[in-house]
Amino acid sequence: MKPPSSIQTSEFDSSDEEPIEDEQTPIHISWLSLSRVNCSQFLGLCALPGCKFKDVRRNVQKDTEELKSCGIQDIFVFCTRGELSKYRVPNLLDLYQQCGIITHHHPIADGGTPDIASCCEIMEELTTCLKNYRKTLIHCYGGLGRSCLVAACLLLYLSDTISPEQAIDSLRDLRGSGAIQTIKQYNYLHEFRDKLAAHLSSRDSQSRSVSR
């Protein structure tokens, strides 16, 4: 007869034959109201669907189906392809497209910021989605750093009156104190309007010189 300790070990041993069960909780989406920047739409933010990393065990098929059932039409993904592989969802972008969700992939390094030209492109694409009343979601890995940075930039992009601090506060009220995670991201927000204006001015100058 086996000693009790070995019986317990065999009963609760999580071997390859008995994989850890995926989480059954619905994926949590936070909806940012854009009413304060004269837009009637909401922008969704969430963590990486289907993520399997450390103690997180989500089911990518289930999460994707939930997003589809929520009516999500466009998704902006800020994870790099390397991250998608690391977090065990290497085919996530294809899966979105198979579900009929339009996918906008704008990779930003974890903890980092996009260059201003890339950020301007993201702002223009987001604005187009929202103006066309498309239900839009953005996500990175945790839904706190890069996603909140982009959402805060959108608030500044859509309104001249909201301040960087107010934009940060809006995201922290929505996603918690971990939103906007690095000094680099914090500084980027405070410099965003000046850099955007310089970029747009340069782009206009180039287009004028080409058309001559």
Swiss-Prot record:
May play a role in cell cycle regulation. Dual specificity CC phosphatase active toward substrates containing either phosphotyrosine or phosphoserine residues. Dephosphorylates CDK2 at 'Thr-160' in a cyclin-dependent manner. Changing L95F: In HCC; patient BX-05. CDD domains: CDKN3-like (cd14505). This is Cyclin-dependent kinase inhibitor 3. The keyword Acetylation does not apply. The keyword Aminoacyl-tRNA synthetase does not apply. Interacts with cyclin-dependent kinases such as CDK1, CDK2 and CDK3. Does not interact with CDK4. Interacts (via C-terminus) with phosphorylated CDK2 (via C-terminal helix). Interacts with MS4A3 (via C-terminus); the interaction enhances CDKN3 enzymatic activity. The active site is at C140 (phosphocysteine intermediate). Induction: Up-regulated in breast and prostate cancer cells. Keywords: Cell cycle, Cytoplasm, Disease variant, Hydrolase, Protein phosphatase. It is linked to Hepatocellular carcinoma: A primary malignant neoplasm of epithelial liver cells. The major risk factors for HCC are chronic hepatitis B virus (HBV) infection, chronic hepatitis C virus (HCV) infection, prolonged dietary aflatoxin exposure, alcoholic cirrhosis, and cirrhosis due to other causes. GO terms for cellular component: cytoplasm; cytosol; nucleus; perinuclear region of cytoplasm. Residues 1-34 are annotated as: Interaction with CDK2. GO terms for molecular function: protein serine/threonine phosphatase activity; protein tyrosine phosphatase activity; protein tyrosine/serine/threonine phosphatase activity. Pfam families: CDKN3. One of its GO terms (biological process) is negative regulation of cell population proliferation. Residues 33-201 form the Tyrosine-protein phosphatase domain. Residues 1-20 are annotated as: Disordered. It comes from the Eukaryota. It is found in: Cytoplasm, Perinuclear region. Its EC number is 3.1.3.16, 3.1.3.48. Disulfide bonds: none annotated. Belongs to the protein-tyrosine phosphatase family. It catalyses: O-phospho-L-tyrosyl-[protein] + H2O = L-tyrosyl-[protein] + phosphate; O-phospho-L-threonyl-[protein] + H2O = L-threonyl-[protein] + phosphate; O-phospho-L-seryl-[protein] + H2O = L-seryl-[protein] + phosphate.
